[in-house]
C-alpha cells in the first residue's frame, strides 16, 4: 500500500496516526520537497533529493535520530553545511551531523560546521571567508551581488539587503 501526501504534511503527526510500520519517502527535486509518500514497511525514513543526473539519498530510522549525539560548535569553522530540504523535512537534525562528523551551529538552526570539506555532503556547502563583520556598511562589497540566508536572525534577507544596500545575486553568500 502506498499513500501520497502534500509536501506540507507534518510527518510526525501522520506517523502517530498511521502507526510505525510505514516507510516514509520524502522526495525533493533541486532542494524543493515535491512528494511525501508512505509505503507499508519497517519504519525507515528515505530522504531523496534529485539534482539533474545526481541523486542524494539519506536513510535512517527514527531511533537512529533519537540516539544520535548532537555536538554544538564553540565557533564557526572553515566550512558551513546545510542539509538538503528532504533531510530537513525527514527530521534528521542530529543524525546528519553525526554521520558527517559535523558540529551544529546552534540547537535551533539546521546549519553545521567543520574544518573538513565533505564533497559528498547531501546539501549545500560554503567556505567561510569571514566569521564576524563588525561594521557591515564598511566591510561588505556593495558592488558584489549577494544571496542572503537568514537563520534565527531578527532581519529577513530582504531587510538585510535594504539596510546595507546590497544587490541580489549569486556572486557571494551572506549568512546571518
Question: Which residue ranges define each predicted feature?
Answer:
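SAM-dependent transferase fold signal centered on methyltransferase-like domains
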Residues: 2-176
Amino acid at each position: 500500500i502506498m499513500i501520497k501526501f502534500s509536501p506540507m504534511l507534518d510527518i510526525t503527526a501522520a506517523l502517530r496516526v498511521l502507526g510505525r510500520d510505514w516507510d516514509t519517502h520524502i522526495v525533493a527535486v533541486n532542494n524543493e520537497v515535491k512528494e511525501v509518500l508512505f509505503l507499508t514497511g519497517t519504519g525507515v525514513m528515505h530522504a531523496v533529493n534529485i539534482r539533474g543526473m545526481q541523486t542524494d539519498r539519506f536513510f535512517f530510522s527514527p531511533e537512529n535520530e533519537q540516539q544520535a549525539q548532537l555536538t554544538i560548535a564553540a565557533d564557526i569553522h572553515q566550512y558551513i553545511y546545510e542539509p538538503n530540504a528532504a533531510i530537513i523535512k525527514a527530521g534528521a537534525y542530529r543524525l546528519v551531523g553525526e554521520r558527517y562528523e559535523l558540529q551544529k551551529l546552534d540547537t535551533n538552526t539546521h546549519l553545521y560546521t567543520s574544518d573538513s570539506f565533505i564533497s559528498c555532503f547531501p546539501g549545500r556547502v560554503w567556505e567561510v571567508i569571514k566569521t564576524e563583520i563588525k561594521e557591515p556598511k564598511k566591510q561588505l562589497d556593495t558592488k558584489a551581488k549577494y544571496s542572503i540566508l537568514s537563520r534565527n536572525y531578527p532581519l529577513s534577507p530582504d531587510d538585510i539587503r535594504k539596510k546595507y544596500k546590497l544587490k541580489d545575486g549569486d556572486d557571494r553568500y551572506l549568512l546571518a
